[in-house]
Structures are given as C-alpha cells and as structure tokens.
Amino acid sequence: DCTRTYVVGGDMSKAPQDFQDAYAVLADAQAAARAAAHPGSTAADIDAITRQAISAAGWGDYFVHRTGHGIGLSTHEEPFIMEGNDLALEEGMAFSIEPGIYLEGKWGMRLEDIVVLTNDGYESLNQAPRDVR
C-alpha cells in the first residue's frame, strides 16, 4: 500500500488554503506516527499520536478511519493501528500508517506508507515523495 495526494493541475499553491493547511497537519501527524513506531509501542499508541496531532489542529472530526493495518498474507490484518488495540508491536512487524482528512463534497487526502519495525525503530518501504504533486 502507498497513498499520495495530488492536486489537479499539479500546483499546490493553487489549492484552497484549508486544503494546504490540512495537508501540512496530515504530513506532520504521519511523521509523528512514524517516529513513534518502534518495538514495544502499541498499536493504540501510534493511533493516539496521529489523532492527537490532527485533532489539535481542529481536523479531528474529519479523520474517520483507523490509522493503519498490518501487511502480510492478507490485505488487512493485525496489527490494526487503532484505538483500543493494546497489541505490543514487535521487530519485523509490517504495517501501514495512513491518516486521512476528508471534507465530504469538497476534498479528501490521505498519506500512507508501509513501515517494518527494526530493533531500534522502523524502515519505510515506500520511497515516493510525500509532498503534494
């Protein structure tokens, strides 16, 4: 899985200001979640860090899905990166970190990367740029 957000016409400066502001929040939230991804943290910890960053900026009501899911034999499997999942994350686990902000009828955005936990953090399996194109 890999999700990036694009602006029709390719010029972020021409996107609505609320879109530009929300994308900056989304990128910061995803970066905070990636930084918190390490063995011993829980799936709920990663979700909470992501939601806190988005909610603090006023966009919390527009983040309507879990933060991520495991990548393995099934498309969606444990660890489900979501509130209430106290599963401790372990080295070698692969999962998505994919927060999104959606304003129905106006615009939506998601930023998704797959990470694999290492003994001291994570490795990102996606190499695509995270900026809006």
Q: Where would I find each of the regions flagged by the language model?
A:
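Active-site neighborhoods and metal-handling regions in enzymes and metal-associated proteins
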Residues: 1-133
